[in-house]
Amino acid sequence: MAMSPAAPLSVTELLLVSAVFCLVFWAVRASRPKVPKGLKRLPGPWGWPLLGHLLTLGKNPHVALARLSRRYGDVFQIRLGSTPVVVLSGLDTIKQALVRQGDDFKGRPDLYSSSFITEGQSMTFSPDSGPVWAARRRLAQDSLKSFSIASNPASSSSCYLEEHVSQEAENLIGRFQELMAAVGRFDPYSQLVVSAARVIGAMCFGRRFPQGSEEMLDVVRNSSKFVETASSGSPVDFFPILRYLPNRPLQRFKDFNQRFLRFLQKTVREHYEDFDRNSIQDITGALFKHSEKNSKANSGLIPQEKIVNLVNDIFGAGFDTITTALSWSLMYLVTNPRRQRKIQEELDAVVGRARQPRLSDRPQLPYLEAFILELFRHTSFVPFTIPHSTTRDTTLNGFHIPKECCIFINQWQINHDPQLWGDPEEFRPERFLTADGAAINKPLSEKVTLFGLGKRRCIGETLARWEVFLFLAILLQRLEFSVPPGVPVDLTPIYGLTMKHPRCEHVQARPRFSDQ
């Protein structure tokens, strides 16, 4: 039976459709913030109703937004749900925003996921950016410096960090050798995350956690639950309905933060019970002493109950970033055996076999340093900073950006910008060496962006760079890493706050010298 053709719309229906269209168009235009005279409106693609540009971001938002920057420029706007988000790309533009106009861009958006990190009191994630926040940040930075990269008069090591990493690297080599003897292969990530946690634990609490501590293992081995949800563009932060629907990643994120906070609260409480005010040996002790001093002065800068919040930020950053960097390093080494041998030849020539590498060897090991810089650039495993927000109406590159606007900083785009690097997809450590290969090209090395910039720059950046260097130097002096012939190594990054690679359980480590 033939279907009759659809009847044409009546004049009334056409008028109604036109009226609805005009109303929607007017509402969209009216919702756009007014731009002061002489300034430009933010460019950007049209998004879907309700969803905005969520589908555009896909599984790799850093790549999708870098692609959009080629069309719309270094400053453009997208929408996630109904929330406008300004995306910044380009090294010069990002430096202008975060360094030269740092006060305008130092805020944090009030994101739903951040409310679960130390119960919304995280110095790193919370929206607070006022004088008290700045003072606490300086205090955390000074305490971290004092018990990591500052000299330790009671040790033969150059600093606390060198002492802790040297000891932990020896333990790590022993664990790798035990696993090789038992099963002939291992997953390096599961071992590295424990070592990194033990090092930052020693700096925070003056002691390394026992190797088999179930509490510590439960926390650090589930840290991936955190980076899944805390990443830029997490849907739960921009689509409120997702908070009320079954959401396994969100529930895992909440559970992890609760366990992590309980673990640190218990550890900080135990540490306070045997705290010696006359002999400060760690970060938490320094914070206790400062808290008591300011309590007597009634300044209230850091009441004792807030100490765990600062320790949470320092401890959390101190093991995830390090673990991720070291794990990526081993994956690149087993897939680049020629470069691994070149690093080892440099270590043999400079350090030899009779002693461990030390931090003072860094200037004489430029190829290892170049490898680390190129690893940071090529993986860009921190693709975005934690989102920023504007603290007041401001202007950037001639564009008007209103107060309390969410800002995404695309670090991945900087590190893969052909104008900066020429061949960004090539892994080539030599690009960071001077013409004679004897030193690092400092101006070029400073363009690698992984730890943020300006007033929100990662307070543990120096610690991270030194720790990654020392771990790799000690491991590569003693061991040769490989995978069996024919075993594929997947280097596809998995998007998150820090991007991980798929786990590889077939890494092997063999002693380089017969007398080991």
From Swiss-Prot:
Pfam families in alphabetical order: p450 (PF00067)
Binding residues annotated for heme, in chain numbering: 458
Single GO MF annotation: steroid 17-alpha-monooxygenase activity
Self-association state and partner proteins as the record states: Interacts with PGRMC1; the interaction requires PGRMC1 homodimerization.
Positions annotated with a glycan in the UniProt record: 69
Triggers of expression: By beta-naphthoflavone and 2,3,7,8-tetrachlorodibenzo-p-dioxin (TCDD).
Record key words, sorted: Endoplasmic reticulum, Fatty acid metabolism, Glycoprotein, Heme, Iron, Lipid metabolism, Lyase, Membrane, Metal-binding, Microsome, Monooxygenase, Oxidoreductase, Steroid metabolism, Sterol metabolism
Site positions per UniProt: Involved in electron transfer with reductase: 403
Substrates-to-products reaction catalysed: an organic molecule + reduced [NADPH--hemoprotein reductase] + O2 = an alcohol + oxidized [NADPH--hemoprotein reductase] + H2O + H(+); 17beta-estradiol + reduced [NADPH--hemoprotein reductase] + O2 = 2-hydroxy-17beta-estradiol + oxidized [NADPH--hemoprotein reductase] + H2O + H(+); 17beta-estradiol + reduced [NADPH--hemoprotein reductase] + O2 = 4-hydroxy-17beta-estradiol + oxidized [NADPH--hemoprotein reductase] + H2O + H(+); estrone + reduced [NADPH--hemoprotein reductase] + O2 = 2-hydroxyestrone + oxidized [NADPH--hemoprotein reductase] + H2O + H(+)
Name under which the protein is recorded: Cytochrome P450 1A2
